[in-house]
Amino acid sequence: MAVNISKQIVLNAGEGLRLQSGPGRDLIFKVTGEDTNGAFDYFIVEVAPHGGPPLHVHHFQEETIHVLKGRFKIHIGGSIHYVNEGGFAYLPSKVPHAFLNLTDEGGEIIVVYTPGGGHKFYEELGPISRAAGADRQLIAAVFEKYGMTLLGGPLIAD
């Protein structure tokens, strides 16, 4: 499927739309679905030591993860995988997944969502999930609004 994208975007390190997800996850969107006619999002996630999202599923989006820094435990559909720097994981839609930075230092991954539009989810989720005493029901409602379901808590190290 060809996507007609005529907008040119060039960004240097650290540039892009900065958003925050849950505690310990900062995001830098290099392009959003708005830039790509809905085709994809491309963003960097700075993951705190031993940080990662809760177990969840995307009902419509596929996700890829490319590890730039750190070592990650990735849960994909009931299987556990360990991915080092330079490693890659493809997470199909409708498959439960989560990841965890296993290192004592911050990790960094590139994430691509297909189709795009994920930045809107993070714009809404960030302030809610980072609030003191974050309301899990409110967080779950944001997931549902954007075509995802929260299934459990974050992964733990072995």
PLM regions: where:
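Hydrophobic small-molecule pocket/channel-lining residues, especially in calycin-type beta-barrels
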Residues: 51, 59, 72, 120, ...
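Glycine- and acidic-residue-biased ligand/ion/polar-headgroup-sensing regions
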Residues: 60-72, 77
